Amino acid sequence: MVLLNRRKIQPKEIGQSADSFSETPWVIKESSERINDYDSDLKKLDFYKRDIFTCEISGKDGLSYFKALKSEEQHREKVRYLLPKELRKAIANFANFSPIRKVGHLVESAFQRFSNRFFIGDTVCLKTIQKNALITYKEGEPNLVESPTIENNVTLFLVKDVFQSNGMMESEKGEISAPKLSLYLITECLNRESKGAALIVGQNEIKRPESHFSKFIIACFLNEILIKVSNKEHAPWRVKQEYIERYDVNPKCSPNMIDYLPDRMNSSSSELYTPLTIPPESDVEPADWKETSETSETSETSLSKIKAIDDEISVSFDHIYDNVNSLAYNDLKGTVDDKELPFTGPSIPFENISYLDSSLEYKNIDQKWFKECSQFPTERLLVVYQFLSFFGRFIGLSHFNFDQFLTTIKCTSPEALVDEYVKINFLKTYNSKGSFTNEKPRNEIYNQVTSSNVSQREKANVFNADESQRIPSNFTRNQKMRKFITDKSTEFVMYSIFKGKPLKNDDMEFQSYEKVNILYIDIVCSLMCLMTDNEPDWNCNLMDNWTEEKRKEEGNKTEIDIAIEKCLNYGDTSWVKLLHNKNFSNGNWLICLLGILQQNTHMIAYSDVAKCITKKILPLSMNFVNLGDELWDNFRKRLSIKDKIDVLWVLVDFASNFSSYIKELVDKVPKLCNGIRLKLDSAKKEYIKLKRQLKTLTKNRVKLHSNVSMNRYGSDECKGKVNALKVKIAYLMEDIAFLEAKLIQSDIKRLEILGKDRNGNRYYWMDSNGSSSAISEKNEELYNCCFLWVQGPSEADINFCLDVDVESLKKWELLAKAKGTAYATKEVFSIFRSTDGSYYQIAQGENFMIINSNGILMRPTIPAFIDKKIISETPEKLLLSHHQWAFFNDIEDIHMLVDRLDDLRENEGQLKKALTSKMDRIEVSYKQQFKIKRRIECDETFKKNHKLLKNNEFTFPELKRIETTCTSNGQHFSNMEKISKKLSRTKNDLVLEAILKDVAHLGECERALLKKQQNLIYPLNFHFEQLRTIDLEFIVETKRKRQEDILTKLLNHQRYKHISHVSGYGISSQRVDKAAHLDVQGILEEIECQLISRRREDEERN
């Protein structure tokens, strides 16, 4: 209907129409009016032609009456053409009784809500620009006003079907909304008809053309269907009655909007505002919007009013829903089994996936991945750390992060204290005469050039006991620096890494390294303290039916039993007494550990581990001076990293299952968490209350500011109150963040499984990560294990999800352990990946392409479930065993994982929801860990050495010169060798005189060269290009020695820094003799005191 001055007008309102009995009426065919006289007709036409009208649909003004009518019809057609019916239903249901009052905000919200949600009949295009256009619009299509122009070379598709998961509840309206991610079946379209091939795409892979979906189109549609519930202030919008049945809109009003309904339900709606007739002063958001949760009681009058209105609505509109479902536009399908959804092609492989090898070093996934994982108890390591991270503070342990935990375990092995050194060798070159030459003698000339730059400590480690043979290093530490060094090798020069000389027990550095073991010893001692209480009784409730009968009688003891008994009663002191008195000094802790392991040998769960460790740490003979030192030496040298982790796991698992003290702590934790939650809820309620007051004061301040006649003092007073409320709200936000971090920190469930993906892989996250940094920036190093871990599927999941039998799985594991996962996958499942990324399947001795390098499926048959897993994870990174553990080393890969997870899948939907809810903390944790590690490893010393290395790099001319100088140098030393031989054989004086002259000449040359070397003593950062005369050989040799020195320091720097970082723990650690009890009331009071003190500090600072 045409508008004039924001008011709807009818033709009868402009002038009097002709009498129906008039014989010669004048007819205006555009408005179907009949006018009696010619003058009235001219006046009416003149009025219609004035440019004073507004189109009710588009809002365009300055039109004549007839142009406005035509504009309305054209825009109605445009809305129906561009917006499919399902999308119009969704928008209508969203806008009906929406809490958003301002029209512009409602249009913006609708655009944001549905810009990435697609419905059947939608016209879409792929986000990637296509080179060849399949479909374009032609000139013969409907010519609409401002008809959409389609970009050239863009293929259009029609949405034919939608695969959706369970809906999510909207907090504002309580209705089901579409999921964030869906799959769509689309087909190529021409003239609004589907043709060509069909594709299945994800929600993030398609978009609507900009000309098909815009805020203007949405505004036109809302202008057509919306009307105010009433003309009361801040009344909500509703859909007009004539559109309710058409778009399946629920006409029932929510209880929180009852006050805005008109007093009489059957009152005429012709006087109600529409989006274009509402006055500008009324088109505002309410400042005193009432939340439904603000009041806990509802008066009897309100309840009766709601019931009466519901009854009236039911009588008027219930017939609409007799044969249709409510919210039919969003009738979502339930979650489906992970096997039922179609295969969408290969995924982009994760680049930064790493694992822990048997030496506790971080490594990128390689060929030895499965072998390392199958021999290393990653799960036990994580279980031990999550136990210590929570209960450590109650058993006297200071906080330590995951990297410190790994370092202290590694340093209990002598191998971890061995340095590495770098050697640079110039390769043999093929000279012009066709013979090979070696430059080794030339190296020995310049051995003195940089020997003063090597420290005494490095001299001891650079050379092995046997000077003629170096031991290549097989360490896996510092992977980035190792790769950096080995990648510097070229056809002229080779960079090699060798093991240094092992440190002896009496070395000063060995004794300084012993400090790093204090953390491991403190952990073991603290766990052993949980076994007994102050009385000489066990503090663990061991159930009789969990033990086996004693296998050996007292009179039938073996040599091992006798040796164990002597160790447990060494020095006429029982190990039980040592444990009871907490006497762990001088190696007594190992005697107590040996006794606890012996007690556990009769428990099925721990018997194998206990027997293996006992056998390894027992002395070979009883001839020793100090039993504690002997046990410690055997513990360090004979036990592997796996054995040392198993020691901690036995103690942790035993205490978790049988310790009454741990049970007491676990029982008190829920009470503590509930107390923190009460404080948190109170703070949130206060925050909501202050926000409401702030809105009210802001509204009053605007009124005072707009009214000039008001007192200025009142405006200033209102401004002061607003600023005070803002300060209080800021304090409350800090308190809420503090309490949320405390709640996370107090929760026991650290290593929780987040969910499983479609292939059965399980994901873990220690939820306390980052909580310390959120509480106090001063203790930002108190992070835990900031990694998202993924574990391979169990045997049951492999059989159920992938349809792989046990025999094939066992065969794959054996081959993967021997030759890697890629080889095993090719042999067992007959699938391999080529260098260009294509996937092939071996059948009858021939290779058939499954997926090409562009990720397109080349075969009509759908791949099997195991084939889908291989293609999605790649054969090199295939997870097919519960022994395989890996972690995401980059936050970008985690974002890629979340985007890849499918809401429709039963398992992945839960996993995606869990990851999304924790994503903020995960991002903070990764960022924090990276920052701390970089600060530790990349300190000023590292930067200085890295800069010196750049100044001493080989240039290409220098490397090329090596090839031409090798021959002359070889001839020079060969001449000296020949002269020496002649001198030893000759007896002729004349010949001898000639030889001596040659020797003197060579001696002068040598002295001149040495003098030149002595004059050329330059600092490490000196640029050799500054020399006027350049001795290329000397420069090359000097650079080589300097590079060896610098690269050796850089290679060992990371390990030095981590060891020194953990060595400081022993100074601050103070293990208590008695475990502390969890005082819930005391902790809650302490939290309250911390809140008060933080508030005072902020006030003083401000």
Swiss-Prot record:
Coiled coil feature spans: 673-743
Cystine pairings recorded for this chain: none
Main location: nucleus
Annotated InterPro entries: DDT_dom (IPR018501), WHIM2_dom (IPR028941), WSTF_Acf1_Cbp146 (IPR013136)
Keyword annotations from UniProtKB, A to Z: Chromatin regulator, Coiled coil, Nucleus, Repressor, Transcription, Transcription regulation
Residue ranges of domain WAC in the record: 23-131
Record bears the keyword Repressor: yes
A single cellular component GO annotation: nucleus
Disordered: region residues: 271-301
Chain ranges of the DDT domain: 375-435
Secretion signal span: none
Subcellular localization: Nucleus
Record carries keyword Transcription regulation: yes
GO BP of this protein: subtelomeric heterochromatin formation
Physiological role: May be required for the activity of an ISWI chromatin-remodeling complex.
Note: Present with 3060 molecules/cell in log phase SD medium.
Full protein name: Putative ISWI chromatin-remodeling complex subunit YPL216W
Species in which this protein is naturally found: Saccharomyces cerevisiae (strain ATCC 204508 / S288c) (Baker's yeast)
